[in-house]
Curated annotation (Swiss-Prot):
Site description Stutter, residues in chain: A305
Organism: Mus musculus (Mouse)
Annotated stretches, region: Linker 1: 92-102
Name of this protein: Keratin, type I cuticular Ha3-II
This protein's encoding gene: Krt33b
Keywords, alphabetical: Coiled coil, Intermediate filament, Keratin
Length: 404
């Protein structure tokens, strides 16, 4: 009778489903007693010659015990798995359904706080703008005050210069008045001298007349005196007019010089005021450009800092992703190695199963039909979830051979 016992399908997934995290060093001995397998077990060439060596029964007994322990372990793991599933279901039924807490109130509070923060930021920005405007206005007023102060100093210096010119003109006027007074005194002196000379001449002429009366009178002294007087008066009047004309011309020239100097001074002052206004406007514009440059530099620095922080964050994210990729690749390599080890274990187990099946078939073919052999439940197929009834076999017959 051929051996029809159904063996359980052994694969790396079945043998390792209960231990997914077993280190690779333990994958070579997945079943108890696997490290004590004889050297000839697992070699597919030893039974192909059609003869058995002296350790045939020991090898079959060893494989039978190993298969029994494996099936016992599978049944134990299935029972533990069922118990764990029952416990998980009971735990899920006992636990209350997870209710998500209501965070709407907190969300509203957070939104209100965010609105307040935004309002505060806008208010701070407005205050900063007002402070900047006030600083600019203060700077403008300071520059205007400095310009007006410089203009005042210039006007005061001009007034001091005009006062000096006025003092000089006053001195010139006093000198001219002194000259006029001296000329008048000289005129009076000349008149007095003239009168004295006239009187002396009259006295002399009178004496001579008395002397000459006795002689014969020749000239009219009164007429001569009148002519001389007229000549002197004309000379004095001419000198007076010349002096007055010279004084008038000098005064007019000085007045013209003063007027022209005052006009030039006013034009220079107006030009200076216009230039100072232009300078003030240019200074204000320069300060505005400086403030704009400072604000643009601050904005540029803030933008650079923000983009550098964002770049560092992106770089950190890239580094994290690269590290995660490295870990995933290492994990994939490790899982690939584990998979290869499991494939090797599967191949070795399949080879052992084939060896075991070949031994059983060859033994069944060599042994004569045993009338004591009892048929077991192996006649009907066994599914993958049914335990194998052929694990334990009884010895019977005079040859003490294994039955079905």
């Amino acid at each position: 009778m051929p051996y029809n016992c159904c063996l359980p399908a052994m694969s790396c997934r079945t043998s390792c489903s209960s231990r997914p995290c077993v280190p690779p060093s333990c994958h070579g001995c997945t079943l108890p007693g696997a490290c004590n397998i004889p050297a000839n077990v697992g070699n597919c060439n030893w039974f192909c010659e059609g003869s058995f060596n002296g350790n045939e029964r020991e090898t079959m007994q060893f494989l039978n015990d190993r298969l029994a322990s494996y099936m016992e372990k599978v049944r134990q793991l299935e029972r533990e798995n069922a118990e764990l599933e029952c416990k998980i279901q009971e735990r899920n039924q006992q636990q209350d359904p997870l209710v998500c807490p209501a965070y709407q109130a907190y969300f509203r509070t957070i939104e209100e706080l965010q609105q307040k923060i935004l309002c505060g930021k806008s208010e701070n920005g407005r205050l900063v703008v007002q402070i900047d405007n006030a600083k600019l206005a203060a700077d403008d007023f300071r520059t205007k005050y400095e310009s007006e102060l410089s203009l005042r100093q210039l006007v005061e210096s001009d007034l001091n210069g005009l006062r000096r010119i006025l003092d000089e003109l006053t001195l010139c006027k006093s000198d001219l008045e002194a000259q006029v007074e001296s000329l008048r005194q000289e005129l009076l002196c000349l008149k007095q001298n003239h009168e004295e000379e006239v009187n002396t001449l009259r006295c002399q002429l009178g004496d001579r007349l008395n002397v000459e009366v006795d002689a014969a009178p020749t000239v009219d002294l009164n007429r001569v005196l009148n002519e001389t007087r007229c000549q002197y008066e004309a000379l004095v009047e001419t000198n007076r007019r010349e002096v007055e004309e010279w004084f008038t011309t000098q005064t007019e020239e000085l007045n013209k010089q003063v007027v022209s100097s005052s006009e030039q001074l006013q034009s220079c002052q107006a030009e200076i005021i216009e230039l100072r206004r232009t300078v003030n406007a240019l200074e204000i514009e320069l300060q505005a450009q400086h403030s704009m440059r400072n604000s643009l530099e601050n904005t540029l620095a803030e933008s650079e800092a923000r983009y550098s922080s964002q770049l560092s964050q992106v770089q950190c994210l890239i580094t994290n992703v690269e590290s995660q990729l490295g870990e995933i690749r290492a994990d994939l390599e490790r899982q690939n190695q584990e998979y290869q080890v499991l494939l090797d274990v599967k191949a070795r187990l399949e080879c052992e199963i084939n060896t075991y099946r070949g031994l059983l078939e060859s033994e069944d073919c060599k042994l004569p039909c045993n009338p004591c052999a009892t048929t077991n439940a192996c006649d009907k197929p066994i599914g993958p979830c049914v335990t194998n009834p052929c694990v334990t076999r009884s010895r019977c017959g005079p040859c003490n051979s294994f039955g079905c």
